[in-house]
Regions:
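Short hydrophobic alpha-helix segments
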Residues: 21, 104-106, 189, 196
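Outer-membrane beta-barrel proteins
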Residues: 44-46, 76-80, 186
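N-terminal segment of the mature soluble domain
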Residues: 1-59, 95-103, 163, 171-182
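C-terminal soluble interaction/assembly domains
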Residues: 167-216
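Solvent-exposed loop/turn segments at secondary-structure junctions
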Residues: 23-25, 62-65, 108-111, 176, ...
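Amphipathic beta-strand/beta-sheet edge segments enriched in Tyr/Trp
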Residues: 54-110
Length: 217
């Protein structure tokens, strides 16, 4: 599951993901550099590469399948169905402040057609990682319009997150809203001003045609 999440988050081009294998390798290089009394600038450069902005911690709580067979009334025939269930709890922690940026208890339920599946476990994990990865991405980096030219809008996100033909509502952000108790910034005013349909997707950028708007965007 973790490796699938890593692959998903990397292809979004929004995250540089450091895994344990990478960190162990970099720590070994750092030890070599410091032992050989290398220039301090090189040590600083390498040290900077080891720093991460966020840490994800999670627990896979459940992963199982369930099969049900229903007998058709007044017949000797029956119909079987199989579903997969997965539960995964996780948190995204901001390293500098130790604050929990986002947390979620994910539950996935998937219909299974085994004739089309090579690895059942791999199928469940792949489906779940796409949904979890999308939730993480939208929580930390929500989709934004980077540019509007005529009736074409450009979104600063591509990859697996955006699909040609998909439709989105365009939201205009207003004044900031603060929690009256903590004085913490909790969001902004939102106003629906249009809709667009995706026409093109690349690794970093997507574009779509605006087919509905409240005013000339």
């Amino acid at each position: 599951l973790i490796q699938n999440l890593v692959s998903y988050l990397v292809q979004t081009r929004k995250f540089t993901v450091l895994d344990r294998e990478y960190l162990n390798h970099m720590n070994s290089e750092l030890n070599i550099i410091t032992t050989n009394q290398t220039n301090i600038e090189e040590i600083v450069k390498l040290g900077q590469k080891l720093f991460s902005d966020y840490i994800m911690v999670g627990t896979l709580q459940k992963l199982f399948t369930e099969e049900k067979t229903i007998k058709i009334k007044n017949s000797n025939n029956s119909v079987s169905s199989k579903k997969a269930f997965i539960e995964f709890s996780y948190r995204i922690i901001d390293v500098p402040t130790s604050q929990i940026m986002f947390s979620d208890d994910y539950t996935g339920v998937f219909d299974i057609e085994e004739k089309d599946i090579v690895s059942l476990e791999g199928y469940i994990i792949e489906k779940a990682s796409l949904e979890i990865g999308s939730t993480i991405l939208n929580a930390i980096y929500p989709l934004r319009l980077e540019k509007i030219s005529g009736d074409t809008a450009y979104i600063g996100q591509g990859g697996l997150e955006i699909v040609i033909g998909e439709e989105f509502t365009i939201i205009e952000l207003g004044e900031k809203i603060k929690d009256s108790y903590t004085n913490e910034y909790i969001g902004r005013e939102q106003k629906e001003v249009g809709k667009l349909q995706i026409t093109q997707v690349s690794a970093k950028l997507s574009s779509g045609k605006i087919f509905q708007q409240s005013y000339n965007l």
